Amino acid sequence: MKASIALIKILKSEGVDTIFALSGNQIMVLFDACLDEDIRIIHVRHEAAAVYMAEAYARMTRRIGVAMVTAGAGLCNAIAPLFTATQSQTPVLLLSGDSEVELDGKGSFQEMDQVKITCALTKYSERINETKNLIPNVLKAIKFAKDGVPGPTHLALAADILNTELAEPFTDLKQDYKSARDVEEPSARLIKAFASAERPLIIVGPFFGMPHFAEKLKELETQLNAPVVMMESPRGFNDPRLGNIKSMINLVDLVIVVGKPIDFTLSYGSVEAFNANAEWFAYI
């Protein structure tokens, strides 16, 4: 079995049924494999659109979003949405065609160090340059995209590797791992702090803005009798959707942050914005 077919079979075993793509050169063998595996391809007119659509698909379906582009300018056009997916905490896998391994360093068509470009914008980026690395790297890319605080990952797929036969027979694989989102029981210190707090505030990150979390967050507010604020706007506390919260946060005596950096949107947790005596717990 060719590596291209095995890759698509892995994606299908992980629940992928749709890929957003712009065709070209090195990835055409993956288009053929998608047709064989009955995976829907939604073709776009620009590579950035493929990644943005994969991000939206992931947020609406609770699945990983997959985008597929070709090498060179194709990969470069797909860069900006990786930053967006990082900020929105959305599990996206970007697959890009790449030049042949056997021609590395010879100035082959669209040769470039893709990983060096994408590594700063993804949770995991790797070039598959040997068939033996195909299965573990694909599974790792999916795991990293979903695990902990979700985000984008990237695999550069060398054209000659995609057309190479696997050395060992392929068997359907499905990952079985405990997600880092399976948070451990709250610490005794947190429980004690929450019990004594008079005005607690819970802040959650963009990941919790996905539609299926809306009711869960309302239930959490009711059960804890504490406001739960989902923050995804770069406006932070100035987001009109949050009403007059900016004038109230300096009254809070306990702040619990889940899945969100204490960044500029939270005024860096400064004493000018928050109660200087407030106790903080952050699960980032």
Residue map of PLM features:
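N-terminal alpha/beta PP-like core and its mobile active-site loop of ThDP/TPP-dependent enzymes
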Residues: 1-284
